[in-house]
Amino acid sequence: MPVMAPTASLLLSPRPLPASRRVPSLPALSASGRLRLRRARADTRLRVAAPPSVPGEADQAPGETEPSTSSADEKFVWRDHWYPVSLVEDLDPSVPTPFQLLNRDLVIWKDPKSGEWVALDDRCPHRLAPLSEGRIDETGCLQCSYHGWSFDGSGACTRIPQAAPEGPEAKAVRSPKACAIKFPTLVSQGLLFVWPDENGWEKATATKPPMLPKEFEDPAFSTVTIQRDLYYGYDTLMENVSDPSHIEFAHHKVTGRRDRARPLPFKMESSGAWGYSGSNSGNPRISATFVAPCYALNKIEIDTKLPIFGDQKWVIWICSFNIPMAPGKTRSIVCSARNFFQFSMPGKAWWQLVPRWYEHWTSNLVYDGDMIVLQGQEKIFLSASKESSADINQQYTKITFTPTQADRFVLAFRAWLRKFGNSQPDWFGNPSQEVLPSTVLSKREMLDRYEQHTLKCSSCKGAYNAFQTLQKVFMGATVAFCATAGIPADVQFRLLLAAAALVSAAVAYAFYTLQKNFVFVDYVHAEID
C-alpha cells in the first residue's frame, strides 16, 4: 500500500470509542514532524487564553473521554466546542490573520506582551473596519488601519488618537463600547483552537479538545501536517473524508490504485450526538471515528511480509479536522503518521531529507484529485435540493443509491447531521441568500493552490519565495555567462562559458517549472493511466 499523505480523503481511528464516555474537543499536531510534536506536547497543561477581564485557565491533563449514547431528540450545540483554526507554525506572529468560523469573521494575532494567541471579532468598534487589515503597533497592540484605534490582548481599547486628552473624550478609551469582542483560545499539539462563543469562557475552560493518538509522539512514527482552504461545504468535505472506498479511484497513482478496489465490509460500533465509530476486519484493517463537530480519525493497519525484515505491521494514522468556515467554504487540517517508509532526520526542518514543502506537493495532489469531483457533486446536490424544496440530508437516501457496506460511514455522517446537527452548522448571520463558491468558481480557481494553501503555509511560502529568488539568480548568471562568452581569446574558455550559460539557463528554467507546484497544477483523471 502506498505511503499515505495528509489528505482530505481518508480518515481512521485508533480504536472504537466506548459508548460510555463523552468525547471532548482538542487541537492537533504541529507539522514539521515528530520532533516538533514532542516539544509541543512537553507541556501537557491545556491553558485557555485569558478572558477579556478575568484570567481563566483549564489546568487539566489532556486525554480522551469516551462518548455516551444519545437519544434521537438530543441536539448538537455547534457553538459549544473548540475549533482548530490553524497550525501554529503556519501563523505569522508579526501580522494579524483573518479567519472565518461558522460564518463569523475573526482576526487572529499574537500578543507580544503575554505571548498568547488572541482571537477577536474582526471589526473595530469605532466604525466597523476589519481589524485584520491592521498591524501590531509599537506598543504590542493591534492597531486598526482606518483611524488608529489600538487594542490589547484582552480586547480593551488602549488608544484613540482622535480623542482629546481631557474631558469626556478622554474617557472614551475606557468605555466598554470601545472594546473589541474577544473569544477563548487554546494552543495544544501545535494547533490554535478558538471557541466561537464570546460568552462561553467558563464552558471553554472546562472543555478539552480531542487529542491526536499517542503514536504521534512515538519516535517510530514519521508525521506530516498540512492545511488548505477548500471551496465546498462542510458536509461535502465530511462525506468525502468518511469514504475510504474512493481512494483507489479519485487518488489513482497518488495514494491508491484502481486495480486494488475491493469490497469494504464496514460495520458500525457506536454512534450518538458525539459522533460515531466503526471498522472492518481483514487486511488491511480500517478503523474510523468521527468526533463532532469536525474531528475525524482513521487508522489503517496492514500486515505485510518483507524479504529481509520478515513480518511487519504497518500502521497509518490520518487525523483530519474539517472546519466549517462559511457556507461553501471549509478548512481542512490533516495530520498523518506512519511507522514505515520514514524519511525524517534528527534536527531542524531545513535538515530533513524530505522537506515539509515537498510532502505538501503530494498532499495537494490528493486535494486536487477530489476538488472538481466534489464541486460537481455539490452542484448537483444543490440543484436537487432546490427542485424538491427539501434539505439534502432529509432526502439523501432517496436521491443517491448506496447498496454496499463501503458507504456505511458516509450514511452514518449524513444520519448524524440530520438527527443531531440540524442538517447544517449553526451559522452566524443569515447566509441563506449567499452564492456558494462551488457554483460560480472556475476549475482554475477551484485548483488554486497559491490562494488556498501556499499563502497560508510557512514552509511552502518560504520555498516558493526561495525558488523565485534562485530562478532570478540563475537567470542573471545566464546573462553574465552569455555576455562574457565571446571575450576570452582561448576557445576552450569560451566553450566553458557557453556551457555554463546553458547549465544556468536550464537550472533557472527548472526552478521556474517547479514553482507551478505551489500555484496551480491541472488535474484530469482521464489522463492518468
Curated annotation (Swiss-Prot):
Reaction(s) catalysed (UniProt annotation): pheophorbide a + 2 reduced [2Fe-2S]-[ferredoxin] + O2 + 2 H(+) = red chlorophyll catabolite + 2 oxidized [2Fe-2S]-[ferredoxin]
CDD domains: Rieske_RO_Alpha_PaO (cd03480)
Top-level lineage group: Eukaryota
Predominant localisation class: plastid
EC class of the enzyme, as a word: oxidoreductase
Cited InterPro entries: Cholesterol_7-desaturase, PaO, Rieske_2Fe-2S, Rieske_2Fe-2S_sf
Induction summary: Induced by wounding and senescence in leaves.
Disordered as annotated region, ranges: 1-24, 46-72
Keywords annotated in UniProt: 2Fe-2S, Chlorophyll catabolism, Chloroplast, Iron, Iron-sulfur, Metal-binding, Oxidoreductase, Plastid, Transit peptide
Entries under SUPFAM superfamilies matching the protein: Bet v1-like (SSF55961), ISP domain (SSF50022)
Gene name tied to this protein: PAO
Name of protein: Pheophorbide a oxygenase, chloroplastic
Pathway entry: Porphyrin-containing compound metabolism; chlorophyll degradation
Tissue spec: Expressed in leaves. Expressed at low levels in roots, stems, panicles and seeds.
Feature: transit peptide: 1-47
Gene3D superfamilies, alphabetized: Naphthalene 1,2-dioxygenase Alpha Subunit, Chain A, domain 1 (3.90.380.10), Rieske [2Fe-2S] iron-sulphur domain (2.102.10.10)
A Pfam cross-reference name: Rieske
Species whose genome carries this gene: Oryza sativa subsp. japonica (Rice)
Note, other: Plants silencing PAO die shortly after regeneration.
Localisation per UniProt entry: Plastid, Chloroplast
Domain Rieske: 82-194
Record GO biological process: chlorophyll catabolic process; defense response to bacterium; flower development; fruit development
